[in-house]
């Protein structure tokens, strides 16, 4: 129990819910991050895996911030996809809160992608969760692209 805290956040794979008494509309939260990762390391070259993971996340970021998307539709500020890594596939997903501008979504996603080495260096899966944006990647499918 947290009697003096009135904010809450719940993260799911396809959405997240953030409730706060602090006015956060159109603002990026740069203070709160939660890092989660798979306990297993990748077999093989970790540097190459990290590079491929960052490339997938960068590609998904560009997809998530497409300006031609209609605001507040199902895929607005959201992207999921996969990348072939030889005989294996890498799956990823990212999203921003829909109150952010496209520019602020991009800034937020850049800030969490930059956390990748700290969070998930060479891990088979990982997440960086933030009240304004989030990403996840795994070596198994966890959302529909």
Describe each PLM feature range.
Residues 1-145:
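Extracellular secretory-pathway ectodomains and N-terminal mature segments of eukaryotic proteins
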């Amino acid at each position: 129990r947290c009697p003096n805290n009135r904010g809450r956040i719940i993260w799911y794979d396809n959405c997240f819910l953030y409730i706060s008494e602090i006015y956060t509309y159109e603002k990026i939260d740069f203070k709160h991050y939660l890092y989660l990762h798979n306990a297993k390391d990748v077999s093989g070259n970790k540097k190459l895996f990290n590079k491929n993971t960052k490339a997938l996340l960068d590609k998904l970021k560009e997809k998530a911030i497409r300006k031609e998307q209609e605001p507040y539709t199902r895929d607005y500020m959201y992207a999921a996809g996969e990348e072939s890594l030889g005989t294996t596939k890498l799956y990823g997903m990212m999203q921003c809160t829909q109150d952010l501008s496209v520019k602020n979504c991009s800034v937020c996603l850049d800030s969490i992608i930059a956390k990748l080495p700290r969070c998930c260096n060479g891990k088979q899966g990982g997440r960086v969760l933030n009240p304004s944006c989030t990403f996840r990647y795994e070596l198994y499918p966890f959302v529909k692209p």
